């Protein structure tokens, strides 16, 4: 999860988020090299008195500044498309969970079970226990098994919402009348926090998301206790 004064990403806890972090570093290095080159050329133009006022054309230079940007764009586009297809791919999910956005809370339904659903509201600041996080704790956490492919179906009952958990690299829009889907898989147990990431009204800031990823045997015990 995030911590005060954090400047970077949250720790990756899913294969997709790890790929996104690698892509970010890859793209950032390319941007840094381009920026350095541009600054170097500008500094030369400002400090040197040498000019080429008689030059009418320079086909070699024009060829270079046409081909080089094309190569750079390819180096950015290929890994980006690879991750995009990875995020859209859904292979035999072990569990399906449907989440609906409301003003201003989330409801969850485990569709593989006959009667396992609940609403998840933010715990008010006045009711927090010592050690709990302000504006991030909920009365009902979403308990899921770790190291298993889970399909999330996301929609909304009223206005636009967005179901987002940064540590897992998830952000899926909740649109009324439309059912979007995404997959998640955590490589380690823990609590993962998120929030609604689409402005949806006066209490938009009070729609936290808490996922509790646990080993399979703990999930089975929890699901049995909820039925």
From Swiss-Prot:
Cofactor binding annotation: Binds a dinuclear copper A center per subunit.
Gene3D superfamilies xrefs: 1.10.287.90, Cupredoxins - blue copper proteins (2.60.40.420)
This protein's UniProt keywords: Copper, Electron transport, Magnesium, Membrane, Metal-binding, Mitochondrion, Mitochondrion inner membrane, Phosphoprotein, Respiratory chain, Translocase, Transmembrane, Transmembrane helix, Transport
Cellular localization per UniProt: Mitochondrion inner membrane
Domain of life according to the entry: Eukaryota
Record has Transit peptide as a keyword: no
Binding sites annotated in the UniProt record for Cu cation A1: 161, 196, 200, 207
Enzyme class: translocase
Binding of Cu cation A2, residues: 196, 198, 200, 204
Mitochondrial matrix side: 46-59
A single Gene Ontology CC term: respiratory chain complex IV
EC number(s) from the headed UniProt entry: 7.1.1.9
Requisite cofactors: Cu cation
Pfam families, alphabetized: COX2 (PF00116), COX2_TM (PF02790)
Alphabetical GO biological process terms: ATP synthesis coupled electron transport
GO molecular function (one): cytochrome-c oxidase activity
TM segment ranges: 15-45, 60-87
Coiled-coil parts of chain: none
InterPro entries in the record: CcO_II, CcO_II-like_C, CcO_II_C, Copper_CuA, Cupredoxin, Cyt_c_oxidase_su2, Cyt_c_oxidase_su2_TM_dom, Cyt_c_oxidase_su2_TM_sf
Catalytic reactions on record: 4 Fe(II)-[cytochrome c] + O2 + 8 H(+)(in) = 4 Fe(III)-[cytochrome c] + 2 H2O + 4 H(+)(out)
Its membrane topology: Multi-pass membrane protein
Quaternary organization: Component of the cytochrome c oxidase (complex IV, CIV), a multisubunit enzyme composed of 14 subunits. The complex is composed of a catalytic core of 3 subunits MT-CO1, MT-CO2 and MT-CO3, encoded in the mitochondrial DNA, and 11 supernumerary subunits COX4I, COX5A, COX5B, COX6A, COX6B, COX6C, COX7A, COX7B, COX7C, COX8 and NDUFA4, which are encoded in the nuclear genome.
Job description of the protein: Component of the cytochrome c oxidase, the last enzyme in the mitochondrial electron transport chain which drives oxidative phosphorylation. The respiratory chain contains 3 multisubunit complexes succinate dehydrogenase (complex II, CII), ubiquinol-cytochrome c oxidoreductase (cytochrome b-c1 complex, complex III, CIII) and cytochrome c oxidase (complex IV, CIV), that cooperate to transfer electrons derived from NADH and succinate to molecular oxygen, creating an electrochemical gradient over the inner membrane that drives transmembrane transport and the ATP synthase.
Protein family per UniProt: Belongs to the cytochrome c oxidase subunit 2 family.
Entries under PANTHER family matching the protein: CYTOCHROME C OXIDASE SUBUNIT 2, CYTOCHROME C OXIDASE, SUBUNIT II
Annotated protein name in UniProt: Cytochrome c oxidase subunit 2
Originating species: Rusa unicolor (Sambar)
Organism placement in taxonomy: Eukaryota, Metazoa, Chordata, Craniata, Vertebrata
Encoding gene, per UniProt annotation: MT-CO2
